[in-house]
Structure formats: C-alpha cells, structure tokens
Amino acid sequence: MGTQNGVMIVMSNPTEGNETAFTEWCETVHVPEVLTVPGVVSARRFAVAQIDLPEVEGIESPPLPAHRYLVIYELDRPGNDVMAELGNRSVSGEMSLHESLDMSTIGLSAWDPITAGT
C-alpha cells in the first residue's frame, strides 16, 4: 500500500437478514464518511472467500472466519490519530451508524508497517 504510517483494518458483519442494506450503507454512506477523516487516503472492501484446499490426508480446509466483511483503509498519519477522530465523530453523530451493522461483531485495529531493523 506504500504508506509510511500503515493501515486501519475493520472487520464486520451485517445484522440478521440485512445484508443488502448493510452493503448499500457501507458503499454509499459509511466508507465515504470515513474517507473524509484526515489521515484516511483510500479504502478497499472485501468479502470473505472460502478456501478449498486439495484433498490431502490430515489437512482440512480452514473454517470461514467470524467476520464476513473487511475494509482496509490506507492511512497517511498515525492510526491512533485517525482512531481518535473516528471516535469523536461517532460520539458527536457526525459519523452515522446503521441498524444493519452488527456492532457486537466489529473488529477494528491499526497496523504499522514493518521496516528493516524493527
């Protein structure tokens, strides 16, 4: 991703029966809102894919992870700064949440790049 400050990873699921509303909200509201936060320069959304390994005795295909959706946000400033601003905007209501987002399953983390010698 070519940034010196890393990425923010968000893993999520829709609430039961709300996949279409969740996808629409993510694409048209939430991701565009996050992209207005200083330090967030890009976003890519992903859906989990089943890994089917060839049949080998003693090796099974891994189970699907608990999260069905992932967003990778590229950052141009420290993740803690971006996370703090996201928190401020969520509390103030400037950043909207939607009933189709299952808040009990959210996974959120910031990742710093590994450079030689660290």
For each feature predicted by the language model, list its residue ranges.
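Macromolecular interaction modules
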Residues: 1-118
